[in-house]
Amino acid sequence: MAKRSGSGLQSSAGLMRYYEADKNAVHIQPKTVLIVGALAGIAVLFLSAVNGFWP
């Protein structure tokens, strides 16, 4: 059987492109997402209580 040549180069080229695109992406810490979500929930509860929509 003949060996395949060149198959490793194509797969590593795709990984390099993905890695380079990932370095340029915006990174948000999970703690930040949780804090923003909690603040948004508290704001909704507060505004609904102030406006008389409390269940």
Curated annotation (Swiss-Prot):
Keywords: Cell membrane, Membrane, Protein transport, Translocation, Transmembrane, Transmembrane helix, Transport. The keyword Zinc-finger does not apply. It comes from the Archaea. It is found in: Cell membrane. Its main location: membrane. It is a single-pass membrane protein. Residues 1-29 are cytoplasmic. The keyword Isomerase does not apply. GO terms for cellular component: plasma membrane. The chain crosses the membrane at residues 30-49. Pfam families: Sec61_beta. Residues 50-55 are extracellular. GO terms for biological process: protein transport. Component of the protein translocase complex. Heterotrimer consisting of alpha (SecY), beta (SecG) and gamma (SecE) subunits. Can form oligomers of the heterotrimer. Involved in protein export. The function of the beta subunit is unknown, but it may be involved in stabilization of the trimeric complex. Belongs to the SEC61-beta family. This is Preprotein translocase subunit SecG. It comes from Methanosarcina acetivorans (strain ATCC 35395 / DSM 2834 / JCM 12185 / C2A).
